[in-house]
Amino acid sequence: MPVVGILRDIPRGAEEACVKTAVECGLKAIEVTMNTASAESIIAALKAAAKPHGIAVGAGTVRHGIDLEKAIAAGAEFIVTPNTRNEIIRLSATARIPIIPGALTPTEVQKAFDLGATAVKIFPVNCVGGPEYIKALRGPFRDIPLMACGGVNPENAASYLKAGANLLSFGASIYDPKLMAAGDWATIAERLKKLLKSIQ
């Protein structure tokens, strides 16, 4: 899953439209943030709709143990966190669920990987130099898969990959909560296609 779409505040009932858009555009991984209303039921519904199409459905913004428990119970296929928390990383790794914790400093990147992270999410990367920061981290951390997150959009996505990011994740630049609430999946699809085309 080199590219992950972040669904924050996706409304209940939009799952089929979301999956249809992902299939149409070629997106293979989506995550629902756990601070979204009805996150667990949305994850379960998305997973049911996405499974026939080979789209992975995960949980994001997993900050506490209870979030992880709910995400796993809902059927999340991977876990993403905004920070480096020992408990979440270890429990996910023990459960053999791919875990991508958030980190920012070199110390956090190494710590997250040592604890069992599948990859490490550099967040918020746009606030600390963007692609140049990924390039700087890539030097000493050649063995650690890095995900760029924070401000990733069609204009800069390719730059992150060129700088050494293995994975990209994006939220409001594509999955704008207002567009999802309005059911404007056509505009979302247009933005998503533009981003995916930029990294082909």
Language-model segments: which ranges?
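Distinct, well-ordered alpha-helical segments
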Residues: 42-47, 113, 134, 160
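Conserved N-terminal beta1-alpha1 strand-loop-helix module at the mouth
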Residues: 1-74, 94, 143, 154-155, ...
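Histidine/lysine/aspartate-rich catalytic loop segments that bind and position anionic ligands
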Residues: 85-119, 123-128
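Hydrophobic secondary-structure block in the mid-to-C-terminal portion of proteins
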Residues: 134, 139-200
